[in-house]
Amino acid sequence: MKMQWKIGNVEIPNPFVLAPMAGVTDLAFRRLCKEQGAGLICMEMVSAKAISFHNKNTEALMEIDPGEHPVSMQLFGNEPDLMAEVAKSIEERPFDILDINMGCPVPKVVNNGEGSALLKDRFPSAPLYSYYEKRSPWH
């Protein structure tokens, strides 16, 4: 059985992925999971708005240990312009993968039109994804 796999050009050594969980996947927990063999570490979702406001708590969420790699960072929001701007502003950070949260079911997130709310209509996230993909540094 082949254990190694890839997302784009990022090699992941095994199939064990630490899911992004708000309030759980802080730096200490991620280190512990990496020590226990996680192949890909996913940070908890980070608000594009909070990054744009230079929120101190958000800065702490984005801290990455050099031993965590490969590591994925997850943005959430619903404003294509802002998300593209934030993606560009953080491209020098040491994460290997950047993704958009489209699955969070928490009412506080969904009621703001973020997370799984991006999937409520048939193709509501297509324009957001297309816009973001074209303007992100990784297209």
Question: Could you describe each region identified by the protein language model?
Answer:
Residues 1-139:
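Flavin-dependent oxidoreductase catalytic cores
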